């Protein structure tokens, strides 16, 4: 159950997901070098501010879709793509924090006993703000059975950029209900 040879579109591996969300080839480091990892997928080492898009939370503009259920006419399940203005990964990915935890291609253990668990990354709309660390590159990732439906899990589709081996995301997580 791995990527088909020559696939044009696919669910990214965990490594591909992390790099697309956290790695910045232009990050200026203290030692004068460039290229490195941001702690959070918003291109910084500052955590996300959970809440509805466009709202102030403790004096800061909300930057991630988790920690709220409803805000006026807006439901946490239907926040439009890109609603958190200016919040994106160094590669331009939108909404890597909140909305849905995203499946990756990586299978974990238990395969030889007839079932597998897949790695998921990021946070979802239903997460408590106390789990902010889950969006940190240093936290690791969760896992779940792909045969179970969770409204908090979705996926991101990636593609190979024509003429290079670099991956980009072309579609954002779709909630599996």
Name each region found by the language model.
Residues 12, 64, 146, 162-164:
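Proline-rich low-complexity regions
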Residues 1-135:
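Functional-site microenvironments in short loops/helix caps that host divalent-cation chemistry
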Residues 150-160:
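Short, structured beta-strand segments at or near domain termini in extracellular proteins/domains
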Residues 162-177:
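A short, hydrophobic C-terminal helix/tail in secreted or cell-surface proteins
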Residues 81, 161-162:
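Hydrophobic aliphatic residue packing
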Residues 110, 138-149:
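Short proline/glycine-enriched turn/loop segments at secondary-structure junctions
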């Amino acid at each position: 159950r791995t990527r088909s040879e020559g696939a044009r579109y696919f669910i990214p591996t965990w490594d591909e997901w992390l790099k697309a969300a956290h790695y910045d080839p232009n990050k200026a480091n203290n030692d004068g070098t460039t290229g490195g990892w941001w702690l959070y997928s918003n291109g910084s080492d500052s955590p996300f501010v959970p809440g509805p898009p466009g709202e102030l939370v403790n004096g800061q503009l909300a930057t991630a879709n988790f920690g709220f259920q409803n805000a006026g006419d807006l439901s946490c399940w239907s926040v439009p793509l890109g609603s958190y203005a200016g919040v994106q990964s160094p590669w331009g990915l939108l909404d890597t924090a909140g909305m849905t935890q995203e499946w990756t291609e990586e299978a974990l253990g238990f395969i030889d006993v007839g079932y597998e668990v897949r790695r998921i990354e990021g946070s979802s709309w239903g997460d408590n703000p106390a789990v902010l660390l889950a969006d940190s590159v240093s936290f690791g990732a969760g896992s779940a059975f792909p045969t179970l439906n969770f409204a908090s899990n979705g996926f991101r589709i990636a593609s190979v950029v024509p003429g290079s081996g670099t991956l980009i995301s072309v579609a954002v997580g779709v909630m599996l209900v």
